[in-house]
A protein has these predicted regions:
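Conserved phosphate-binding elements of NTP-dependent enzyme cores
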Residues: 1-939
Length: 939
């Protein structure tokens, strides 16, 4: 067996058609093809699954039952496999404790660095807290110039009020004759009476010594006596010189602030030892949001201004409010904003113990009749959220709460002891908040002592290597404290790449899923260089990718096709990018060679003359910008990664419009105002989330075409004779479905330490319905046959039924004709799910006043798919609607009517509008990175 290639024989996973393919090892290999052609089936479900399965199979049967073992892929043989690591976009942790720092393991090295070379600084007195052994204290004194006169003092009172008579008695009992009070030396018999209300310092004079040979033993005794009397502190007063304060434990001698021994766990917000006790290491606390509770202060109490207390199923709170208002003389018909301030405060925070009489009788005859204080709506929501055992109630209360930075730790997640430790005047929380490019500079400029340099060198190398990689893949705008759950799929994948680069493994098979997603063309070169570095370490990279630059940079290209679904699953072309470009059978090759291309529109739409205007957008890194969105156009929001695109569109525009149009309680990002929304009726977010959460959901049920098909079957003569209604043809309810598998068509068999096996139901043979239901036919086909049809076949089959035909034709129009009507929604890719949502919008009757938002709709799409997607978006705009896309793909940007380019950089250096206008106008703005790359596409 050759060691320089991976040989796959007879792969039949999903739509793969018994293919044989050779993949060269230690090279960067791209697998490309149309969406749904079988790329992921080959890369992830065949190659990765078999590599992972073989590893797990090498473990004991006991260990295997705890691991999620993968099914053996349907393939005859795979030779030359290495241990495989999959880096996709679906496995990002949503745990709030998972951050960029923890995922990349930079946090582990940072914690070690602070534990080894950090300096504890008292937060109150701003002096360094040090700890020395008696031997170190003695050495410090011995190192002083010979004949230096010193006195060793025990500081027993530090800045405390009082006359301290008992302290003087104790000193006398201990046999000491001299002490220093507020800087003046006194004999114990001559101590003055101290002012009671003044703060005093009192130190016992333990010994007076001249530095010379032979005093080490005497110094030891004196220091031990001072430490015993002053609870671990000793003060050396150099006569006519300075003072040296010593401590045998980490504690401030002035305020008593203590810190334990520095160890890495002190700097972990995921460990009780280091986490902030107030927020449990999360950095945020849930607080009731007054604006969510009272979104419309112009309303009155009677009109329901206090939203959480509006009657849904009970009159309890409305009646309580009315009776309290009567008692406290609050007018129910005055707008909340015009009520006196003290009445507003009472409604929000309660009556401060003042009672009112409350009488309430529920629907079951229960009566409450008592004098109670009025709780106030904000306190009521907070109490109910924390006290309830009901998930429903907690979820309801959560709607009116917001996360605010914890005031105790300032959002740094750590306790005061961890945050007092500094390196170059910054604590670990402050370092975690720096953008990665600034953090790199911080570590490059680090000033350490010679000994600290030796300790820190290997730790700093690990930190800097990972930070440099994050910078190289275009993520230098992120901070290490950024929650992993807030990252896009592309960002998360590139962060996991950073971890792998840091591990410096070789001989590994890496399988990646579109690492270029979410990356601006400017940053693509750096990503490609990083991928090549992984290859040069002796690894094999198999990348599912559509990006032209990445394909051209690859060593080997595999084009899967020719179509999607049943029309795909074959190897169309293999070889270098140049060889594939010359292959006339390869659709990818035609785009690489320039024979096919997405044309530049001949003219740009002018819109309907109306616009939505957003003023003062200042969320995250947005710099108080004002943006206009012309209606009736295809608008592209562009910019480098981290420039503020998602903040502008998803956090402000989408939420602000939803709040105005739908009275949505989701609070939009920081902005002054939004106007012009009266010109639209609906805001529709078409994202890549699954169209259904269960395997029972499918394209037929999602588009509601299955309702029409069931109506059609219920109208057949056979159904009428048998008395079958529409419900008989549903696989979700009893009656027509097979009860052995409950309409699933398959049965799960648990295998414990082997993966679960799914087998066709023995009763219905995978058809989902009982035999009586399957006897009803339309044009010779039963309901199960229809669900197994591809959409392309179904369009032809139902072409005489306009209602069904129109819905199915829109699915074909978005390029999904290859999927089956009954295909489980959970098997659709993100791009397929998004296009299915677009299809459902296309067949709806539109009044041309919809505002569609799409976030990177080209994710997972081949250039040919993008051409089809653009036609769909243009159909929506041609109906008078507005389509707003966040996009990096230059084919989409050049096809837009209006472009808003944010930047110029990511993070704090972004957040401004660099260019706006038609693609041609943006291309002429020299400061715009998007414009520079766009120019080539417009020529």
């Amino acid at each position: 067996m050759a060691n320089d290639k991976i040989n796959i024989h007879g792969a039949r996973v999903h739509n793969l058609k018994n293919i044989d393919v050779m993949i060269p090892r230690d090279q960067m290999v791209i697998i490309t093809g149309l969406s749904g052609s079988g790329k992921s089936s080959l890369a992830f479900d065949t190659i990765y699954a078999e590599g992972q399965r073989r590893y797990v199979e090498s473990l004991s049967a006991y260990a295997r039952q705890f691991l999620g073992q993968m099914d053996k892929p349907d393939v005859d043989s795979i030779d030359g496999l290495s241990p495989s690591i999959s880096i996709d976009q679906k496995t990002t942790s949503k745990n709030p404790r998972s951050t960029v720092g923890t995922v990349t393991e930079i946090n582990d090295y940072l914690r070690l660095l602070y534990a080894r070379v950090g300096h504890p600084i008292c937060p109150n007195d701003h002096i360094e807290i040090t700890s020395q052994s008696v031997e170190q204290m003695v050495d410090k004194v011995i190192d002083l110039p010979e004949r230096t006169k010193i006195q060793i003092l025990a500081p027993i009172i530090v800045k405390k009020k009082g006359q301290h008579k008992k302290v003087f008695e104790m000193i006398q009992r201990e046999g000491y004759v001299r002490l220093r009070i507020d800087g003046t030396i006194y004999d114990i018999s001559e101590v003055p009476e101290l002012e009671k209300n003044k703060k005093h310092d009192i130190e016992i004079v333990i010994d007076r010594i001249v530095v010379k040979d032979g005093i080490r033993s005497r110094l030891f005794d004196s220091f031990e006596a001072a430490l015993r009397l002053a609870n671990g502190y000793a003060l050396v007063d150099i006569i006519d010189g300075t003072e040296m304060l010593f401590s045998e434990h980490y504690a401030c001698p002035y305020c008593g602030f203590t810190i334990g021994e520095l160890e890495p766990r002190l700097f972990s917000f995921n460990a009780p030892f280091g986490a902030c006790p107030d927020c449990d290491g999360l950095g945020v606390k849930l607080e009731v949001d007054k604006e969510a509770v009272i979104p419309y202060p112009e309303k009155t109490l009677r009109e329901g201004v206090l939203v959480p207390w509006n009657p849904i199923s009970s009159q309890y709170y409305p009646e309580m409010l009315e009776q309290a208002a009567a008692c406290f003389s609050i007018d129910m018909d005055t707008p909340f904003e015009k009520l006196p301030k003290e009445q507003q405060e009472l409604l929000l925070y309660g009556s401060n113990g003042k009672l009112f009489h409350f009488h309430y009788e529920n629907d079951f005859g229960g009566v409450r009749d008592t004098d109670v204080p009025f709780e106030g709506i904000l306190k009521n929501i907070d109490r109910r959220y924390h006290e309830t055992n009901s998930d429903f109630t907690r979820d309801q209360m959560r709607l009116y709460m917001t996360e605010l930075p914890c005031q105790s730790c300032c959002g740094y997640c750590l306790n005061p002891q961890a945050l007092c430790v500094q390196i170059n005047d910054k604590n670990i929380g402050q370092v975690n908040e720096l953008p990665i490019k600034e953090e790199l500079k911080f570590f490059e400029d680090l000033i350490l002592s010679e000994q600290e340099e030796i300790i820190a060198r290997p730790i700093l190398k690990e930190i800097q290597d990972r930070l440099i990689f994050l910078k190289n893949v275009g993520l230098d705008y992120l901070t290490l404290s950024r929650a992993a759950g807030t990252l896009s799929g592309g960002e998360a994948q590139r962060i996991r790449l950073a971890t792998q680069i840091g591990s410096n493994l070789s001989g590994v098979l890496y399988i990646l899923d579109e690492p270029s997603i979410g990356l601006h063309q400017r940053d693509n070169d750096r990503l490609i260089a990083s991928l090549k570095k992984m290859r040069d370490l002796g690894n094999t990279l198999i990348i599912v990718e559509h990006d032209e630059d990445t394909m051209r940079a690859s060593d080997y290209l595999i084009d899967v096709g020719p179509g999607a679904g049943k029309q795909g699953g074959e190897i169309i072309a293999v070889g270098t990018p140049e060889e594939v470009a010359k292959n006339p059978a390869s659709l990818t090759g035609q785009y690489l060679s320039g024979k096919k291309a997405i044309p530049v529109p001949k003219e740009r739409r002018k819109g309907n003359g109306k616009q939505i205007k957003l003023t003062g957008a200042a969320e995250n890194n947005l710099k108080n910008i004002t943006v206009t969105f012309p209606l009736g156009e295809l608008i592209a929001v562009t910019g480098v990664s981290g420039s503020g695109k998602s903040t502008l569109v998803n956090q402000i525009v989408k939420k602000a419009l939803a709040q105005k149009l739908n009275r949505n309680s989701n609070k939009p990002g920081k902005h002054k105002s939004i106007s012009g929304y009266q010109s639209i009726e609906k805001i529709i977010d078409i994202d890549q989330r699954p169209i259904g959460r269960t395997p029972r959901s499918n394209p037929a049920t999602y588009t509601s075409v299955f309702d029409d098909i069931r109506d059609l079957f219920a109208q057949t003569n056979e159904a009428k004779v048998r008395g079958y209604k529409k419900g008989r043809f549903s696989f979700n309810i009893k009656g027509g479905r097979c009860e052995a598998c409950r309409g699933d068509g398959i049965i799960k068999i648990e295998m414990h330490f082997l993966p679960d096996v799914y087998v066709p139901c023995e009763i219905c043979h995978g058809k989902r319905y009982n035999s009586e239901t399957l006897e009803v036919r339309y044009k010779g086909m039963n309901i199960s046959d229809v669900l197994n049809m591809t959409v392309n076949d179904a369009v032809e089959f139902f072409k005489s039924i306009p209602k069904i035909y129109r819905k199915l034709q829109t699915i074909v129009d978005v390029g999904l004709g290859y999927i089956t009507l009954g295909q489980s929604a959970t098997t659709l890719s993100g791009g397929e799910a998004q296009r299915m949502k677009l299809a459902s919008e296309l067949y709806k009757i539109s009044n041309g006043k919809n505002f569609y938002i799409l976030d990177e709709p080209t994710t997972g799409l081949h250039t040919d798919d993008i051409a089809r997607l653009l036609k769909v978006l243009e159909r929506l705009v041609d109906k008078g609607n507005t389509v707003l896309v966040i996009e990096h793909n230059l084919d989409v940007i050049k096809s837009a009517d209006y472009v808003i380019d944010l930047g110029p950089e990511g993070g704090e250096e972004g957040g401004t509008i660099v260019a706006k206008g038609t693609p041609e106008e943006v291309a002429n703005v020299g400061e715009s990175y998007t414009g520079r790359y766009l120019k080539k596409y417009l020529d």
